[in-house]
């Protein structure tokens, strides 16, 4: 667990990756339990951002007007990732689906190995009233942050993931390959790419 991970978050124009688009990708590199690098880019979406989404994320059409295209932003993000295992909160149901849709539209191959901290938190911290990232952040007594911006969310999740790694070590899980079995149950926290 002392390797490098890329903790990331996305913001989008809506909830369905089939018809909605990325508006921001934020990420941090976690090395040996510390956040060491940051990445953030707006993305010019394939449709206007609604006032409801602007209200939620603070991202306006003006902010993304001159942003990189989806393909350019995704390439820059994948260059930053550089083959590291991805870590995201609710990644399986949301962020990975959006990245896959963007990759497909852009003709970019994208089959990552990733860890979903939502599933991980459900296994590690049973009994929380919900498993939103902010709830876990508060449960772990970490500093508050501005939610619904990819740069802030990924940095906060990086700090959360560092605590989770320490908690995993206390459970005698010392390698990424042992996360699923080490946490028990039938939850698949680590999703490996299929060859």
Where are these regions (language model features)?
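Conserved non-catalytic scaffold segment of RNase H-like nuclease domains
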Residues: 1-112, 126-148, 194
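Acidic two-metal-ion nuclease catalytic site recognized across multiple nuclease folds
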Residues: 1, 160-195
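Short secondary-structure boundary/hinge segments and terminal tails
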Residues: 72, 121, 154-155
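Acidic, divalent-metal-coordinating active-site segment for phosphoryl/phosphodiester hydrolysis
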Residues: 149-162
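Conserved beta-strand -> loop -> alpha-helix junction used to position metal-binding or nucleic-acid-contacting
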Residues: 109-121
